[in-house]
Amino acid sequence: GVVGQQAYMPWWLAGQQHKLDFPGGYKALLVSGRKMPSLNTGKSFDRVSGGDGIPFGKKLKEDARRYHGSFQSIGAQGAMAANDDCYCELDPGVKDKWGIPVLRFHWKWSDDELRQVSHQQQAMTEILEAMGARFFHAPYVDKPEKAISQGGKIIHEVGGVIMGDNPEKSVTNQWGQTWDVPNLILGDGATF
């Protein structure tokens, strides 16, 4: 699908998943387009113009004419399987202004996600090379931890609240209504 100056390329290897060394898949996100110059416009010119630092004066004008609007980026957003290192709990020492314990989150990428990112980096590199692209930096095929974002930074995380038909084993019923708080309905993605 296309959204503004973005295009999404759905997971294309679903039928070959058994041959890969990670579960799940990912989608590619292609971003480009022209827009009005801003204060950040010149920050990328030094990477492509071969200069030392951000250009000024005549060189900046030349680079702006040559490179502005000609950048393309490709990213990927992938599936993450639940693992024992990712959970939240009530913090025993920190309370909010009403005296209620706050949530403390624990997060760790598994080897599966890191292998997925290596695959993403290789696939996106091949796509960009086929387009004749020049790279600002070498892809992180062998260093996926440099390419992967912090958990929750890019995608909208869901889950954490169990939906079910037993109040002893779930937080909500099948309609997202909580068992313990009358008339409280969870309308976000927490139950998924």
Language model features by range: what are they?
Residues 161-179:
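FAD-site-proximal beta/loop scaffold in flavoenzymes
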Residues 82, 150-155, 164, 171:
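Short, functionally important structural connectors and interaction interfaces within domains
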Residues 47-54, 104, 110-156:
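Mobile, glycine/GP-rich and aromatic-enriched active-site lid/loop segments adjacent to catalytic centers
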Residues 90, 124, 163, 176, ...:
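Hydrophobic, well-ordered secondary-structure elements that form the walls
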Residues 1-103, 108-111, 154-157, 179, ...:
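FAD cofactor-binding and catalytic pocket of flavoenzymes
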Residues 83-84, 97, 144-148, 170:
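Flexible loop/turn segments at secondary-structure boundaries
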